[in-house]
C-alpha cells in the first residue's frame, strides 16, 4: 500500500427523507454491489418498522442506538523491540461513526429474522436499549483496551 498520498475525504450528501448525512452513511454501509436504491428501501422500511414498534421518532431511536454503540477506545497493534503490543488508543470522531455504522450493519446481517429491514430495525431497537450484538462488540473492545492499559505509554 502506497504511503505517498492520503485519500481525500469526500463529502456525503444528506439523504432525501431525513435530510441527515448519517442516514446516507448507513445506506452506504448497507449497500451491496452498488445497489443504492435497494439499500435505501431497506433503511427506510427499517425506520418504518422502528416507528411502528416503538411509537417514537425513528431517527431519534437510531441516533440513540449510534450513541450507545460508538466506541471511545480501540486497540492498535504496535511492534516495539521485536514484540507486538496491543496499545489502547482514542478513536477519532470520524472513525467512531464509521465503526458504529459498520458494527450495526454487520450484526444486523448476522441476525435470524427473515428480511434485512426487519433485522436492521431490531438491531437498532436493541442498540437503543443497550442490548444486541453491536453493543457487545463495543463492550468487548473497551474491555480489551482496559486490559491492555499498561501499554498506553506506547501510544504514538
Swiss-Prot record:
- Gene encoding this polypeptide? rpsG
Q: GO MF terms on file?
A: rRNA binding; structural constituent of ribosome; tRNA binding
Statement: the UniProt record of this protein carries the keyword Chloroplast: no
Please name the HAMAP family in this protein's record. Ribosomal_uS7_B
Q: What InterPro entries does the database record attribute to this sequence?
A: Ribosomal_uS7, Ribosomal_uS7_bac/org-type, Ribosomal_uS7_dom, Ribosomal_uS7_dom_sf
This protein is called what?
Answer: Small ribosomal subunit protein uS7
Summary of subunit composition and partner proteins: Part of the 30S ribosomal subunit. Contacts proteins S9 and S11.
One Gene Ontology CC term in the entry: small ribosomal subunit
One Pfam family linked to the record = Ribosomal_S7
Record flagged with keyword tRNA-binding: yes
- UniProt-listed NCBIfam families: rpsG_bact (TIGR01029)
The entry's family comment says: Belongs to the universal ribosomal protein uS7 family.
**Superkingdom in the source lineage:** Bacteria
Its function, per the record, reads:
One of the primary rRNA binding proteins, it binds directly to 16S rRNA where it nucleates assembly of the head domain of the 30S subunit. Is located at the subunit interface close to the decoding center, probably blocks exit of the E-site tRNA.
Q: Which UniProt keywords apply?
A: Ribonucleoprotein, Ribosomal protein, RNA-binding, rRNA-binding, tRNA-binding
- Biological processes annotated in GO: translation
Q: Provide the species name.
A: Mycoplasmopsis pulmonis (strain UAB CTIP) (Mycoplasma pulmonis)
Amino acid at each position: 500500500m502506497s504511503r505517498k498520498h492520503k485519500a481525500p475525504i469526500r463529502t456525503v450528501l444528506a439523504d432525501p427523507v431525513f435530510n441527515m448525512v448519517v442516514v446516507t452513511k448507513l445506506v452506504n454501509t448497507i449497500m451491496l454491489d452498488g445497489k443504492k436504491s435497494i439499500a435505501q428501501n431497506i433503511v427506510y422500511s427499517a425506520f418504518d418498522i422502528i416507528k411502528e414498534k416503538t411509537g417514537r421518532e425513528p431517527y431519534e431511536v437510531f441516533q440513540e442506538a449510534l450513541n450507545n454503540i460508538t466506541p471511545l477506545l480501540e486497540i492498535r497493534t504496535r511492534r516495539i523491540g521485536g514484540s507486538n503490543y496491543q496499545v489502547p488508543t482514542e478513536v477519532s470522531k470520524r472513525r467512531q461513526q464509521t465503526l458504529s455504522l459498520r458494527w450495526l450493519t454487520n450484526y444486523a446481517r448476522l441476525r435470524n429474522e427473515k428480511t434485512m429491514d426487519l433485522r436492521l430495525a431490531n438491531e437498532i431497537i436493541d442498540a437503543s436499549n443497550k442490548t444486541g450484538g453491536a453493543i457487545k462488540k463495543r463492550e468487548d473492545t473497551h474491555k480489551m483496551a482496559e486490559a491492555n492499559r499498561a501499554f498506553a505509554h506506547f501510544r504514538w
